[in-house]
Amino acid sequence: MILKKVFLLVVFISILITSYAQTKKDVVPLTQIAYKTTETIIIDGKADETSWEKASWSNDFIDIEGFKTPNHQTNVKMLWDENYYYILATIEEPHVWGDIKERDAVIFYNNDFEVFIDPDGDTHNYYELEINALNTIWDLFITKPYRELNNPILNDWNYTGLKSAVTVNGTLNNPNDIDKGWTLEIAIPFKDLRTAYEQDNIPRDTFWRVNFSRVNWQYQITDGKYERKKDAEGQFLEEYNWVWSTQGVINMHEPEKWGYVYFSSKNVGEKDNFSIPKDEKIKWKLYELYRAQKTYFEKYNTYATTLDSLTGSSIIIENKKLNPILESHKTGYNLSVLSPFSNKILILKEDGKFISK
């Protein structure tokens, strides 16, 4: 356990250094509607229920930075009922392999599929789930993104009612043939995803912030077994990261960039509409200021006290000019703005937590 905590600290430092060194690009999150099913979904990796046939596939996954087309295709479908959030992933892979069998081990050392969920969209207290082709699970509860200090990561936290199953279209761990890929079927219990005790944790006709990621490694065969490929110096080659909704940087832990999954109360096969609320677009701009503050702090070891020191004193949303307020205090700052769309005050704290009043 101590070694795993040290590893997570190393990951945190690495992400903190690299994500702000990368060139930022504007990210427009994707949306998808998850329709309700009244059919019993058997989690067996086969997805042969009528509801799955009616559900729509997502777009093809894209490289995490948004620039490159992945070598192999990945797609997801989604459903929900009164108890579970269902996810179906098809993962094209000519060589299906895996060797990690211990729960809560570092699953992304194998090729894997990952689910990130932030039910209330405040970028804090979110969930990460990683599963490999052996159906080995790593689930975490993350109190704050790695970019923040004092961010306990609850690696011992587990989904209590999670169901998952894998089917392989080909063979597993056989380097002598070519496979088509693997299919992963997941049922995440809503009871494990409470945003607060006083809230109904079943998201009827509302959205959650969600993203999906696929880690894919180049491989080599050693003594007839797959392993991650190494360079001439014996170092592992970098992995590929392919995602549903692009992050713009090699960092899944910027939850404000995740996609929007709308849980429609209409049954699968019916039609519903969802558009991203205008207040969410204001949030995007506030997070741009937040990231600018991060960059400013790295350079001057203090936060900016005026918006003009960052990216300007106003923002434009839907042809409306908004004037955010930057308030400094002993431990950092608050960014706030009055939404002309909802008449709510939108607040972003120095640790990235979003509040709406």
State what each model feature region is.
Residues 1-26:
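Bacterial Sec-dependent N-terminal signal peptides
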Residues 22-301, 317-333, 343-345:
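Structural preference for beta-rich elements and adjacent junctions enriched in aromatics
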Residues 106, 342-357:
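A short, surface-exposed beta-strand/turn
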Residues 304-319:
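Short solvent-exposed beta->alpha transition segments
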Residues 335-338:
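Short beta-strand segments that buttress and anchor functional surface loops
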